[in-house]
A protein has these predicted regions:
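Generic N-terminal targeting/processing segments that precede catalytic cores or assembly contacts
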Residues: 1-91, 121-210, 214
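A structural signal for small-residue-enriched, beta-sheet-centric alpha/beta enzyme cores
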Residues: 9, 15, 222, 227-246, ...
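Cationic, low-complexity basic patches in intrinsically disordered or flexible, solvent-exposed regions
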Residues: 99, 114, 131-133
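Acidic/polar hotspots within intrinsically disordered regions
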Residues: 114-115, 123
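Short, amphipathic C-terminal "tail helix"
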Residues: 396-425
Length: 426
């Protein structure tokens, strides 16, 4: 009897958890302490959370433990805390005002005086977002809300993200969720004045080291993310979005040349054998064709692609996504690169040998022993380059370097040395 495939369980984003924590804190400020919180996500699903109170000095926080479902999310199980306080003493702070007409986080910034609780306004809380609702229906106008963060939420240090440089990485949709959740509570009590919402993730700084944040220029913590409020398990789209965002950020920074590497092998090879710093490269995983296309669309004029032969040999066969779930034609493609001048009987015998190999490294041993490795690799990298240029739409120069962990550089296209030398000294 065929076993039914297990249905994977979805979870909630950091944005949804932060909104729930802030909502619980808002209730507490009104004198109503909750142990459970419900809210509707932008995707329409109603989320229910158990909340935990934590008293830290004179601050009272309410926490929600993130449940990412069956998604392999490093933030699964992390506690996300929120606090809401009345701003009551004069103290200047910088705020980033969210424009009604633009939710892309290109904000106008002003410096003003507001009443701020001295104990709540500690170092690291120097910037805050102020909510300006889209319509009067969103907010009665009797109070103002400001949103900032404590430890564990990263600070944006590079342009091109959906939050301005110098602000905490709290993305537009989560910000709106947080503001609306607190607004709904405060309006029930006819609140007046200014209120400060703070977020805190105790493990955020450590967790961030396991994410793309350091590479994206988000320092000191994780991001508060989400568009639908729901985490869909095993999402390829999330990884693709991250890769595309990093390429976009480099273009925004004025870069016109790019290094792409599928993964850790390529990055290590760049550093150890080519003398190029790891952080110079964008890791594109298995999304080879997509990364090339995104780079061309972003305006890159040059791409240096460096990857292990075990992955790039697939590209020589026109494979756009090198994940094994799309098939494994490595040996067939390798055999197809054998010299056309071979005697038919020899070619058939050598083809059978290659097709019987389990790894590309094993196949390379045969090619080396037959004295044709350089010829085969020249053919392979030429084909890789041809396909990559096609995927770029003919809009940029693509050079390729492929290597083996045993034999080092196996093949490279004609102008790759020039690009390597320039990157080495950049």
């Amino acid at each position: 009897m065929k076993e039914e495939k297990k249905q994977l369980r979805s979870g909630f984003t950091t944005g949804t958890c932060a909104a729930a924590a802030a909502k619980a804190a808002a209730f507490f400020l009104t004198g109503d302490e909750k142990t459970q919180i419900s809210l509707q996500t932008p995707g329409g699903r109603v989320a229910h959370f158990q909340v935990q109170k934590l008293v830290d000095g004179e601050m009272t926080w309410f926490g929600v433990q993130k449940d990412a479902g069956d998604d392999p999310d490093v933030t699964h199980g992390a506690w996300i805390y929120g606090a809401v306080s009345r701003i009551s003493k004069d103290m200047g702070f910088r705020r980033s005002v969210e424009s009604k007409s633009d939710r892309t986080c290109e904000k106008k910034e002003t410096v003003e005086k507001h009443d701020v609780d001295q104990e709540a306004w500690t170092d690291g809380l120097a910037r805050a977002y102020e909510w300006e609702p889209d319509t009067e229906a969103d907010h009665s106008g009797q109070f103002r809300l400001f949103l900032t963060a404590k430890d564990g939420i990263g600070l944006v240090t590079k342009p091109g993200l959906s939050c301005p440089v110098g602000n905490y990485a709290i993305n537009p949709v989560p910000r709106q969720m947080i503001f609306q959740s607190v607004t709904h509570v405060l309006e029930e009590t006819e609140a007046h004045g200014d209120y400060l919402i703070q977020l805190w993730i105790p493990a955020g700084r450590e967790l961030a080291l396991k994410t793309f944040n350091p590479k994206l220029g988000i320092e000191g913590g994780i991001s508060i993310l989400g568009t639908t409020g729901i985490v869909n398990p095993m999402s390829e789209q999330a990884l693709m979005d991250t890769i595309r965002l990093e390429i976009h950020m480099r273009a925004v920074a004025g870069e016109h040349s790019l290094i792409l590497a599928p993964g850790n092998y390529g990055e290590r090879f760049l550093a150890e054998h080519l003398g190029i710093a790891i952080d110079q490269a964008v890791t594109c995983s298995n999304f080879i064709a997509d990364a090339i296309r995104w780079s061309a669309d972003a305006g890159m004029s040059e791409i240096l692609f460096v990857g292990h032969i075990g992955k790039l040999i697939k590209v020589a066969g026109g494979v756009k996504n090198t994940h094994s779930k799309y098939g494994d034609r490595r040996m067939e493609i390798m055999a197809d690169c054998l010299p056309g001048t071979l005697d038919e009987q020899v070619r058939n015998e050598w083809t059978d040998r290659i097709l019987g190999c389990n790894t590309t490294e094993e196949a390379l041993e045969y090619l080396k022993s037959w004295g044709i490795c350089d010829q085969v690799m020249h053919t392979a990298v030429s084909r890789m380059q041809r396909y990559m240029k096609q995927w770029a739409g003919g809009n940029c120069d693509v050079q390729v370097v492929t290597f083996s962990t045993v034999y080092g550089i196996l093949g490279k296209t004609s102008d790759s040395d020039r690009m390597i030398e320039r990157w080495r000294h950049s």
